[in-house]
Amino acid sequence: MILSSKYKLVILNLIGGLVIFFALILLRLPVLINSDQNLTADEALMANHIMDLLNGGPFYFYYDFARYFGITNGLAAIPFFLILGVGSLAFKLPAVCFYALYILSTYWLVKKIHPQAALTVVLLMIFSSPAILSLTTMNYGVGLICFLGNLIFLSFFNVKETGGTKAFYCFLLGFFIGFGIYTFTYAIVYIGSILILFVLSNNSWNTFRSKISIKVIASGYMAQKGGVQKFVSILDGIILFFILTVLFSYVFGGFGIDIAGFSIMQSNELHKPVGQLLVLVIIRICLFRQDVMDKLNSTKRLIRSTAPLIRRSILFGFLGFAIGIAPRTASIFTGETIRGGQGFDVDFVPTNLVNHFWQLMTHYIPDVLGLWAPILRLFDYRMNLFYFLNLFLIAIIVLLIGRAIVLFITTRWKDVKDIFRLKALSFNPAQFLLVLPILICAAVIVSQGPPATRYLFPLHGVVSILVAIYLQKIRHKSKIFFTFALVAWCMFSSIETYQGYVKSGMVRNFSIIKLPDHYSKILEFCNQHKILHAYSDYDTSAIGTFLSKGNVQIAEYTKTVWAYKSKERLAGKDDFAIIVRNESALKNYQKYLDGNLHSYSKNIVKVGNGINEVYYVFSSFKGEKGAIDRLRSLIVG
């Protein structure tokens, strides 16, 4: 039987994806073998949510701790739970799978931009920096949203290539946008990128741009007759702003604008602004209703003037978006989500902007590219053979990345200027490599919170694409240098990865070491003493609950909690213990117990060889019920 070209393509992509996945597994083997020891509290919190769901618990669309992050990454762990059993390894494997899909989808992207560089970019992304390797063993959904981001780009390119006449591509674009927003609102950088490219490459942009200048708006305002109409025109602007704010809050989860710590605007409540908007609309209609029908008729004429195929495609796009974002919509209608939250808080104080820019350029971007740690080692190591090898490889990698970026920007300098000036663009798929990094860096700089490596994750893919394109141009001139550059890249990544494993203790003399698991000892103690419910710090509560497979339910002993559903469940349990490892918390509990309870038991559980590697377990409390209940939330935090 002869397979058609489409089936062959599907099979080749499937095989390629599996090869990438297993190559990534091999490079991450020390971390995966020590998955219990490398499980983070955030991962454990998400894993507990999925474990409760599998055990028959209620279904929620979001985790306890946030409304900007759906449970897609956790649901992806269910097949691994069913095959491998509930555990850290099964929860971490989806992160590797997502990164494999991200690499495969990047291959598809490069096939549209520079087909000869597609395989090269796969190799470059497999041999990543230690920072990227670490992130792709943590099931935070970062690789997943980057994969969905690539699908958004690919769908957008197909829509542009077909002139928006293919309803299926518009449906896919809408679906991936909606589902990306639900999965992780970080998708906004991808949505913003295609929005900029769509607007600037639209044939009507120059005409529209000429009508939105300050001069045109001011003259239109002055042309209004009478004070009432002028006031109504201002009110129209306020109503438009309210509409956009409400839509943004419902879709993305709200935003906040601060200057020097002072809140200028917060968009947190979901339903309250809708009522305010209706009041404004009613006031507007009462003041001046004569032009309302004109505006409605203008809207109808605009819709009717659109070609039927385009109109059909737009409807399919909205349908796809509605289906993709349906989990978030359902969470709002069921009452699970009642606040937009502060998902996009920005602070425009100059010192904040300068500080974030400096951190970005001197630490976080070098860390994403794998240059931060080796450059630091140049100041620590003595001048031996490894020192000069390290210096040589750093020079090669910096040269490759620098030359690739400079070459790409200089050949598209007109596009760069037009993007910053908001001038019309002649569309080219490669332009996303200009817009996406600009949006990511700008978002990190203006963010109220400090920069983080995970928010720069897509830059790794962008740089890999640019280097792959540059190497393909070099290959036509010198295949020897092309091969040498690839070997240097892979060697640099491998050495840095090995150094990281050695430093963490997971590898010694090229052998993988199984690290001791501190949590197993405290869980063993709980099982021996029949402790089924306890309160502890964030890490111990989340990780301990998951590693015990829910047999020991541990909630946070702080007044402010992340896993509030877990704490609500334990509130009705009278028999509980307090597990403490923090010195400050130990003093607080010891003082409170001695001063407010009649009696209690205290046990010390040694979990390591270090002097501070101990847990203190308080249980068997005797005293007034109110005094005992206050133990559940004694720590401020």
Regions picked out by a protein language model, each given a short descriptive name:
Residues 53, 112, 149-173, 180, ...:
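Membrane-interface transmembrane helices that cradle and orient dolichyl/undecaprenyl
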Residues 215, 220, 333-408:
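Membrane-lumen/periplasm interface segments of multi-pass, membrane-embedded glycan/lipid transferases
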Residues 17-20, 97, 106-128, 146-147:
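Transmembrane-helix signature of polytopic, membrane-embedded enzymes
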Residues 31-41, 54-89:
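Membrane-proximal lumenal/periplasmic loop motifs of glycosylation machinery
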Residues 18, 196, 318, 391-396, ...:
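Signature aromatic-anchored transmembrane alpha helix within multi-pass, membrane-resident enzymes
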Residues 29-33, 88-92, 99-102, 123-146, ...:
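Aromatic- and kink-enriched transmembrane "portal" helix at the membrane-lumen/periplasm boundary
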Residues 2-6, 155, 162, 190-234, ...:
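Perimembrane helix-loop-helix junctions
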Residues 135, 189, 267-277, 384-396, ...:
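Hydrophobic/aromatic-rich transmembrane helices and adjacent perimembrane loops
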